[in-house]
């Protein structure tokens, strides 16, 4: 069973027979139906069908029709389609070795490192034959199976302005450093040293979550899994139309990047409210709008 099925309201599926019933609904009553033809000599028809069990949240199945017209299920996954685009990003796409799926990667200067995500719309990528490495609109989202609500850090208006200015300066320095600017590289080194010194000093008397407001850290052996700490900007309740299970969707500000995540209410500790923070593990997903390259 897919471990994130519970996020979209299927925590009680315990057997393959129960799962097949749900996947059968996706196959016969899809909300979205896409297809493409494989690039190899067989030219098999690749099918991608999705069924929403709540708004923008559900299950996608992917497979192929053979020469005799029989459908072979290759892969399925739960999803949450985000509502907030992260803007144009230079995205590279890679086929996964372990399954018939694709992974996306982009560099975001707000993090200073690469972000890796599971590609939701693989059939769009196959049919578009788009080359990797181009700037295209990207919308990120995440599914979580464990999370807690934390209180916010008390911030004055002056502190918010100063933090925004520091963040803008940091992005500018990272951009310059990528282009080989030695002064920017030295400035970033000094900033890292100052940050380390500040944390070392404050951690003696304060909790780490009073010092660190948001974070985005790779988690576990899967490259698209992260431990995140983000500020809640919107809360949306969901109810699975088939099972009645309740989930919560939240818009998070994480290191200056806004994206939506969802979690089953049974897996969430605390009451989510705007201004509070969410901490948990997420499986990061992304939808790329292929063919809409930045001019």
Where are these regions (language model features)?
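N-terminal alpha-helical "arm" segments
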Residues: 1-43
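Long, hydrophobic alpha/beta structural blocks
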Residues: 38-220
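OB-fold and OB-like beta-barrel modules that bind single-stranded nucleic acids
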Residues: 230-232, 275, 282
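OB-fold (S1/OB) nucleic-acid-binding surfaces
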Residues: 231-261
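Short, Lys/Arg- and Gly-enriched loop/turn segments at beta-strand edges
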Residues: 283-295
């Amino acid at each position: 069973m897919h471990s994130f099925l519970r996020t979209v309201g299927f925590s009680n599926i315990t057997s393959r027979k129960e799962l097949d019933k749900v996947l059968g609904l996706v196959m016969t009553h899809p909300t979205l139906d896409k297809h493409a033809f494989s690039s190899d000599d067989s030219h098999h028809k690749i099918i991608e069908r999705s069924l929403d069990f709540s708004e923008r949240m559900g299950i996608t199945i992917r497979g192929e029709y053979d020469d005799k017209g029989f459908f072979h299920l290759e892969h399925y996954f739960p999803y949450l389609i985000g509502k907030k685009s992260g803007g144009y990003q230079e995205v590279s796409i890679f086929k996964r070795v372990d399954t018939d799926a694709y992974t996306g990667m982009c560099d975001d200067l707000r993090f200073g490192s690469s972000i890796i995500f599971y590609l939701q719309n693989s059939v769009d990528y196959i049919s578009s034959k788009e080359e990797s490495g181009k700037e295209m609109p990207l919308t990120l989202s995440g599914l979580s199976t464990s999370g807690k609500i934390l209180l916010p850090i008390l911030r004055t208006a002056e502190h918010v302005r100063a933090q925004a200015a520091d963040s803008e300066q940091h992005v500018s320095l990272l951009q310059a450093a990528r282009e080989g600017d030695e002064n920017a590289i030295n400035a970033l080194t000094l900033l890292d040293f100052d940050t380390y010194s500040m944390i070392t000093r404050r951690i003696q008397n304060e909790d780490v979550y009073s010092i660190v407001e948001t974070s985005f850290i790779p988690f576990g052996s899967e490259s698209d899994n992260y431990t995140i700490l983000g500020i809640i900007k919107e809360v949306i309740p969901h109810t699975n139309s088939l099972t009645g299970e309740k989930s919560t969707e939240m818009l998070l500000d994480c290191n200056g990047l806004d994206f939506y995540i969802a979690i089953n209410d049974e897996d969430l500790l605390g009451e989510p409210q705007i201004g509070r923070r969410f901490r948990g593990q997420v499986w990061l997903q992304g939808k790329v709008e292929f063919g809409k390259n930045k001019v």
